[in-house]
């Protein structure tokens, strides 16, 4: 599908960090879903990044981390800071930097916020950003994004048992699509590299917490003269 004649010329763009991509996704989303509060304040933007629903992975970032990422995005001209309010407010410039139409921006936004999606899922989840007539129109824009140089999305191999291929954005860099080839097709989503690192960190945190609690239980049992390893009363 061809872009509109007045689509801006795309600019070269470095790989984004997961937080930078999340910020852009939140700005586009809130521009359409809560236009009365757009451009967004720092507090609203951080809350949108940490939102528990419609996000994969769920993040827990601070205002300072968001501010640092915003500074980097402003340097790339991807975000502008407004000066008409006492409270700094931020808006995206994604369509001009990438040189793509609003339909493609809607699809990229959902991919940045929710992770890999099928074309059908993208049509459903982007409804508040752009109303696609059918799945074919979604696929047409995805194909165009995938054939750009450099490509902005990639079609992932179909997982065993899955009926449709999923798509993933490439704003955070290339992915090894082979990692997704053997993914379980039973409804679980394949994990992106950034998500995998977050999961490993969370696993380590939980393991450390379990070890700390075990040590606490043993110390309390020792103070009470109880054998912490003894089996409990069966009655």
UniProtKB/Swiss-Prot annotation:
Q: What is this protein called?
A: UPF0502 protein Bmul_3231/BMULJ_05293
Top-rank taxon of the source lineage equals Bacteria
* Coiled-coil ranges from the UniProt annotation: none
The disulfide bonds in this chain are none
By its UniProt entry, which HAMAP family does this protein fall under? Answer: UPF0502
> From which lineage does this chain's organism come?
Bacteria, Pseudomonadati, Pseudomonadota, Betaproteobacteria, Burkholderiales
Q: Hey, which family's this protein in?
A: Belongs to the UPF0502 family.
